[in-house]
C-alpha cells in the first residue's frame, strides 16, 4: 500500500510531519495553490500515473484533489481518509474573490468553482472517510465552522463515512485520535486487498 499525503491550500507536505512520524513515510504531493486547481490536478495525475494501491491521507483542499484523483484513476486507489475537507466548497470564497479578483485560490475553492462542482458529481467508489472538525469559530462565517471551513461543507458528500472530532482545522493534523482513525481505515483497506 502506498500512502499518498496531500496537504491543504497554502501549506506544504511538512504539515503532515507528525502524522508521518506515526504512520510512516509515503508519497508527498506538494502543490502551489496559485497554479490553479486544474494545473495542479494534471501534475498530480502525472506524478501518480504508475503508482498502485494508493491510500490517500489529505487535509482540507488536499481532500478535494484526492477525490478528483480517485475518480480519474479508480483502479489505482484503495481508499482515503481526508481531514477537514470542505466537499461543499468554502462559501466565503465566492464573496472574497470579488475583493481579491487575482486570487486563483479563491476562484478554485468556492462552491460555484469548477473543482467543487465537479467534486459534487463524483460518486465515491472506494472506502472514504472525512474527519469532520467541529471546534473553532471564525468571525467571518455565520455558519458553525472549525475556524476555516463550515461543518456543513465538511459533511456535504453523503456517500462517505463522516467522523466528528472535537478539534479545529489545524489541530487535526496533530492528533493521536485522528492517527488511530487513519490506521483503522488503512488496515481495513489492507485486509480487503488481501482477500
Across the structure, where does each feature detected by a protein language model lie?
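Hydrophobic, Leu/Ile/Phe/Ala-enriched alpha-helical segments that form helix-helix packing faces
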Residues: 23, 48, 186-190
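Structural alpha-beta junctions
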Residues: 24-27, 157-159
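Short, surface-exposed alpha-helical segments at coil->helix boundaries
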Residues: 13-20, 151
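Serine-dependent carboxylesterase/thioesterase catalytic core
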Residues: 3-7, 14-17, 26-126, 138-141
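C-terminal catalytic-base region of ester-bond hydrolases, centering on the histidine
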Residues: 11, 123-195
Amino acid at each position: 500500500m502506498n500512502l499518498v499525503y496531500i496537504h491543504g491550500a497554502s501549506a506544504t507536505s511538512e504539515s503532515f510531519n507528525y502524522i508521518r512520524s506515526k504512520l510512516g513515510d509515503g508519497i508527498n504531493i506538494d502543490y502551489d495553490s496559485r497554479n490553479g486547481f486544474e494545473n495542479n490536478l494534471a501534475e498530480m495525475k502525472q506524478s501518480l500515473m504508475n503508482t498502485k494501491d494508493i491510500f490517500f491521507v489529505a487535509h482540507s483542499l488536499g481532500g478535494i484533489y484526492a477525490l478528483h484523483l480517485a475518480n480519474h484513476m479508480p483502479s489505482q486507489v484503495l481508499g482515503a481518509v481526508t481531514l477537514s475537507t470542505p466537499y461543499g466548497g468554502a462559501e466565503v470564497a465566492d464573496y472574497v474573490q470579488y475583493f481579491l479578483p487575482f486570487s486563483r485560490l479563491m476562484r478554485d475553492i468556492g462552491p460555484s468553482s469548477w473543482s467543487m462542482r465537479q467534486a459534487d458529481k463524483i460518486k465515491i467508489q472506494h472506502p472514504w472517510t472525512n474527519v469532520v472538525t467541529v471546534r473553532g469559530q471564525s468571525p467571518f462565517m455565520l455558519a458553525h465552522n472549525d475556524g476555516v471551513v463550515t461543518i456543513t461543507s465538511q459533511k456535504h458528500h453523503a456517500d462517505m463515512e463522516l467522523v466528528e472530532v472535537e478539534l479545529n482545522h489545524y489541530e487535526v493534523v496533530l492528533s493521536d485520535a485522528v492517527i488511530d482513525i487513519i490506521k483503522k481505515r488503512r488496515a481495513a483497506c489492507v485486509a480487503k486487498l488481501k482477500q
